[in-house]
Amino acid sequence: MGRGWDWADMLAYTVSGYGVVSMDVRGQSGYSQDGLRSPLGNTVKGHIIRGAVEDREHLFYKDVYLDIYQLVEIIASLPQVDEKRLSSYGASQGGALALVAAALNPRIQTTVAIYPFLSDFRRVLEIGNTSEAYDELFRYFKFHDPFHETEEEIMETLAYIDVKNLAHRIKGEVKMITGLDDDVCYPITQFAIYNRLLSHHA
């Protein structure tokens, strides 16, 4: 979906006593838009590869990760928030961003990540294109670099946003949920995150 859930979907958390903050990812059809750097409306493909040809500073997800960090800082500064009890939660892209939030900001004490996306891009290339989620990687090489002459450079750049490379930074407790028959966010790419966690995890 690429955007925060509808508020009605979060009522179960609020009636359980949790304060809830939801983030729209820039340029992905949420209620808030980043008109300066992302087009208005929805974009489905191109987020992973965007900026990878230039360098890691131009990566789309680098900016999204900075958004996540800033969001945690804003939440922690609110007077009604106990910054020692912050958690992150999400599924797919949201699962990846929940882990990124915990990796970049040690204020996050617990994280629940359901079938997290954005991990082990090299393994994704080895598996082959079976789903829309990573299609843009294969389309890049098919149409722009069919001989894979830039593959090493692209993979090195994408390593900067690969969630598995951030996993060791997480200090809080992590719970991960996956499906072993997931052909969108492949389980083996999720294990790459799980196996690099140094904090308590299940």
Annotate each PLM feature.
Residues W5, L11-T14, G19-L66:
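Cap/lid segment of the alpha/beta-hydrolase catalytic domain
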Residues H47-S92:
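Gly/Ser-rich "nucleophile elbow"/oxyanion-hole loop immediately N-terminal to the catalytic nucleophile
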Residues A76, Y89, G95-P106, T111, ...:
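Short glycine-enriched nucleophile-adjacent loop
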Residues E149-L166:
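Active-site nucleophile elbow and catalytic-triad environment of alpha/beta-hydrolase enzymes
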Residues R169-I170, M176-T178, D182:
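Short beta-strand/loop motif that positions the catalytic acidic residue
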Residues D183-T189:
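Conserved alpha/beta-hydrolase "acid-adjacent" motif
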Residues Y194-A202:
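Catalytic histidine neighborhood in serine/cysteine hydrolases
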